[in-house]
Amino acid sequence: MTLLQREENIIRKGNIDKEFSEKIKAAGGDSLEYCFQCGTCTGSCPSGRRTPYRVRQIIRKANVGLKDEIISDPTLWMCTTCYSCQERCPRKVKIVDVVKLARNEAAKAGFMAPAHKAVGSFVIKTGHGVPINDATMELRKAVGLGELPPTTHQFPEALEEVQKIIKATGFDQLIGYNWETGELE
């Protein structure tokens, strides 16, 4: 059996989600049709050098409408949104917009990397994706800054506002945050 004859390499009409393709195009991904699969995006990707993440495959699947294959793929979360792929794309495809939209769809469908959920939990608890620690406070003092930045760390009352927004948008439910335990479910 050749590579092309493998069952997993066959695109079936039933797997194509035209609504997903249209949603991507409506969100600025209409440039997707210009992609001719040159591979510049994948070759430019710093994450792709160290992981199985291949942005070119995601773009191809998005163009075809293979929503389920994209949103269930754990490598979707390996993109750092550095824009290296998009800046180098000879066809000016809005690659990062496509990745972000695909991640939103993945999250809605229950596919989200545990590390991303953990960052979301930190935002709920502290207002920051990366909470301040003792070492950072010492560094801030050493360069003449206050120990705490002028954010929710310095103004804890602002955290309540952040948490209201999180509840109003349903972000807490999206990541499975339990307000009683303060942990992810």
From Swiss-Prot:
Sequence ranges assigned to domain 4Fe-4S ferredoxin-type in this UniProt record: 25-55, 68-99
Biological or metabolic pathway of the protein: Cofactor metabolism; coenzyme M-coenzyme B heterodisulfide reduction; coenzyme B and coenzyme M from coenzyme M-coenzyme B heterodisulfide: step 1/1
Assigned GO CC terms: plasma membrane
Pfam families: Fer4_8 (PF13183)
Reported cofactor(s): [4Fe-4S] cluster
The keyword Cytoplasm is assigned to this record: no
Quaternary structure, from the entry: The heterodisulfide reductase is composed of three subunits; HdrA, HdrB and HdrC. It forms a complex with the F420-non-reducing hydrogenase (Mvh), which provides the reducing equivalents to the heterodisulfide reductase.
Family statement drawn from the similarity comment of this UniProt entry: Belongs to the HdrC family.
Protein name: H(2):CoB-CoM heterodisulfide,ferredoxin reductase subunit C
